[in-house]
């Protein structure tokens, strides 16, 4: 089994941010010597650097779908890495439409890019980024690293994909945004880590009550996202090593704490469980990690098992 590190850079579902609250969705994965970012919601650039990683080390980026809380800061991340000295190409994988996003970004920043090439002698950012649009099936096979995609149920978005990363016997699966979707259990079968989105229904009701478009928002949330107990059901059916709740809805309700998430999930999942929070680090150091249930804290936001 490979050693790996997962850093939850942003754990909030939805694009809005509030004072003192968490950031939208992005995750750093270090696996098989590769530096991988999954989704690029607002705050991803600072999140990567706060995780102790140089932006010059960016290698692979994957976007699960084109909702803004998953893609808004992709361009800024790449541009900032470029100004920080990025000198090697970066591959960006995502659904149909991602290349249009990227071309629009570099067109909007054309003045800055051109003048930095001339004035600072930088390589051309536009030639350093390769955008690869994908559908279901194999996305990448590079040495011992493979990535596959499964189209999930996130209406009205049709191009939304769960991702499975595998390297030398280790498997990490991201649910992406999805309603309860039974085929995801087969896709995540035997994974060491399943990062699955989650909602708490009582929190949704309070969220809806304080928004101007409450009825429409509730309809969208209930049709397009998974309740915490449903995430537990997928984890149980898949037989994963650990369930990590991510993309939390709501993530910034002061009346909801970690115990509420745990209570909801324990109705369907009795295995190892981590409730996501910004900056949390999951580290695997040895070969028996899948069978360990007793993660222990090694810092303010690190969970490590061996």
Describe each PLM feature range.
Residues 1-179, 184-186, 259-289, 297-305:
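Binuclear metal-dependent hydrolase catalytic cores
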Residues 162, 171-173, 179-278:
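Cap/insert and terminal regions of metallo-dependent hydrolase folds
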